[in-house]
Protein backbone atom coordinates (compact mmCIF):
# COMPACT_ATOMS: atom_id res chain seq x y z
CA UNK A 1 0.00 0.00 0.00
CA UNK A 2 1.41 3.40 -0.99
CA UNK A 3 1.25 6.42 1.27
CA UNK A 4 1.31 8.72 -1.75
CA UNK A 5 -1.98 9.48 -3.45
CA UNK A 6 -2.36 11.43 -6.70
CA UNK A 7 -3.35 15.04 -6.20
CA UNK A 8 -6.61 16.33 -7.58
CA UNK A 9 -5.27 19.89 -7.60
CA UNK A 10 -3.57 21.57 -10.50
CA UNK A 11 -0.78 24.01 -9.69
CA UNK A 12 -0.68 27.18 -11.77
CA UNK A 13 2.54 29.15 -11.99
CA UNK A 14 2.71 32.83 -12.84
CA UNK A 15 5.67 34.13 -14.78
CA UNK A 16 7.71 36.76 -12.97
CA UNK A 17 11.11 37.83 -14.25
CA UNK A 18 13.40 40.68 -13.26
CA UNK A 19 13.95 43.23 -16.02
CA UNK A 20 15.66 46.57 -16.32
CA UNK A 21 15.04 49.66 -18.40
CA UNK A 22 18.09 51.83 -19.05
CA UNK A 23 17.37 55.30 -20.40
CA UNK A 24 19.94 55.95 -23.15
CA UNK A 25 18.85 59.59 -23.38
CA UNK A 26 20.36 60.07 -19.89
CA UNK A 27 23.72 58.36 -20.58
CA UNK A 28 25.58 61.62 -21.24
CA UNK A 29 23.69 63.48 -18.53
CA UNK A 30 21.39 66.48 -18.83
CA UNK A 31 21.40 69.71 -16.86
CA UNK A 32 18.49 71.33 -15.04
CA UNK A 33 17.44 74.00 -14.92
CA UNK A 34 18.39 75.00 -18.44
CA UNK A 35 17.43 77.88 -20.74
CA UNK A 36 14.19 76.15 -21.76
CA UNK A 37 12.89 74.65 -18.52
CA UNK A 38 13.42 73.63 -14.91
CA UNK A 39 12.03 70.14 -15.57
CA UNK A 40 12.37 67.27 -18.01
CA UNK A 41 9.74 64.64 -18.84
CA UNK A 42 10.57 61.20 -20.20
CA UNK A 43 7.72 58.98 -21.40
CA UNK A 44 8.37 55.24 -21.49
CA UNK A 45 7.00 51.68 -21.47
CA UNK A 46 7.92 48.72 -19.27
CA UNK A 47 6.75 45.58 -21.12
CA UNK A 48 4.83 43.25 -18.83
CA UNK A 49 5.30 45.42 -15.72
CA UNK A 50 3.35 44.10 -12.74
CA UNK A 51 2.52 45.72 -9.39
CA UNK A 52 5.60 44.66 -7.41
CA UNK A 53 8.07 47.08 -5.75
CA UNK A 54 10.81 48.23 -8.15
CA UNK A 55 14.03 50.28 -7.89
CA UNK A 56 15.25 53.40 -9.72
CA UNK A 57 18.96 54.33 -9.88
CA UNK A 58 20.54 57.57 -11.12
CA UNK A 59 23.55 59.83 -10.61
CA UNK A 60 23.88 63.56 -10.03
CA UNK A 61 26.60 66.21 -10.22
CA UNK A 62 25.74 69.49 -8.56
CA UNK A 63 26.83 73.10 -8.94
CA UNK A 64 25.76 75.30 -6.05
CA UNK A 65 23.08 74.04 -3.67
CA UNK A 66 20.20 72.99 -5.91
CA UNK A 67 16.94 71.43 -4.81
CA UNK A 68 15.47 68.65 -6.92
CA UNK A 69 12.71 66.11 -7.18
CA UNK A 70 12.01 63.02 -9.24
CA UNK A 71 8.51 61.71 -9.92
CA UNK A 72 7.41 58.48 -11.54
CA UNK A 73 3.76 58.74 -12.55
CA UNK A 74 1.92 59.56 -9.27
CA UNK A 75 4.87 58.72 -6.98
CA UNK A 76 7.45 61.27 -5.80
CA UNK A 77 10.61 59.17 -5.53
CA UNK A 78 12.87 61.88 -4.09
CA UNK A 79 12.86 65.48 -2.94
CA UNK A 80 16.23 66.79 -1.79
CA UNK A 81 18.03 70.08 -1.22
CA UNK A 82 21.83 69.96 -1.27
CA UNK A 83 23.81 71.55 1.57
CA UNK A 84 27.44 72.70 1.82
CA UNK A 85 28.78 69.36 3.11
CA UNK A 86 27.28 67.25 0.30
CA UNK A 87 29.63 65.76 -2.27
CA UNK A 88 29.48 67.23 -5.77
CA UNK A 89 28.90 63.84 -7.44
CA UNK A 90 26.58 61.24 -6.03
CA UNK A 91 24.66 58.10 -6.97
CA UNK A 92 21.12 57.49 -5.76
CA UNK A 93 18.54 54.75 -5.54
CA UNK A 94 14.94 54.67 -4.35
CA UNK A 95 12.38 51.93 -3.90
CA UNK A 96 9.32 52.41 -6.11
CA UNK A 97 6.24 51.09 -4.28
CA UNK A 98 4.03 48.53 -6.02
CA UNK A 99 0.99 50.82 -5.88
CA UNK A 100 -0.19 54.32 -5.04
CA UNK A 101 -3.73 55.52 -4.38
CA UNK A 102 -4.07 55.89 -8.17
CA UNK A 103 -3.25 52.20 -8.83
CA UNK A 104 -0.05 50.43 -9.92
CA UNK A 105 2.94 52.78 -9.72
CA UNK A 106 4.58 51.32 -12.84
CA UNK A 107 2.53 50.27 -15.83
CA UNK A 108 3.32 48.38 -19.03
CA UNK A 109 2.67 51.58 -21.04
CA UNK A 110 2.20 55.32 -20.55
CA UNK A 111 4.71 55.92 -17.75
CA UNK A 112 6.16 59.38 -17.11
CA UNK A 113 9.44 60.13 -15.36
CA UNK A 114 9.80 63.80 -14.33
CA UNK A 115 13.03 65.46 -13.17
CA UNK A 116 12.91 68.95 -11.61
CA UNK A 117 15.68 71.20 -10.27
CA UNK A 118 16.03 74.80 -9.05
CA UNK A 119 18.39 77.06 -7.07
CA UNK A 120 21.66 76.01 -8.65
CA UNK A 121 22.47 73.54 -11.37
CA UNK A 122 22.20 69.76 -11.37
CA UNK A 123 23.29 67.19 -13.94
CA UNK A 124 21.20 64.00 -13.91
CA UNK A 125 22.42 60.87 -15.67
CA UNK A 126 22.61 57.08 -16.00
CA UNK A 127 18.97 56.42 -15.08
CA UNK A 128 17.94 52.76 -14.76
CA UNK A 129 14.74 51.16 -13.43
CA UNK A 130 14.68 47.54 -12.22
CA UNK A 131 11.17 46.08 -12.33
CA UNK A 132 9.26 42.79 -12.40
CA UNK A 133 7.61 41.62 -15.62
CA UNK A 134 5.19 38.84 -16.47
CA UNK A 135 6.79 38.44 -19.93
CA UNK A 136 9.78 36.19 -20.54
CA UNK A 137 10.44 37.69 -23.97
CA UNK A 138 10.01 41.22 -25.23
CA UNK A 139 9.60 42.06 -28.93
CA UNK A 140 12.34 44.20 -30.42
CA UNK A 141 11.22 47.21 -32.42
CA UNK A 142 13.32 48.37 -35.35
At which residue positions do the language-model features occur?
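Beta-strand-rich recognition domains
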Residues: 1-142
Amino acid sequence: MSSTEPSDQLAVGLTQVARYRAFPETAGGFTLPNAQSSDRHIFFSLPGAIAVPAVIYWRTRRFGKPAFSIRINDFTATQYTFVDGDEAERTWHEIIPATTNAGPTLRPDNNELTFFARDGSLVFGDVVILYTSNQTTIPLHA
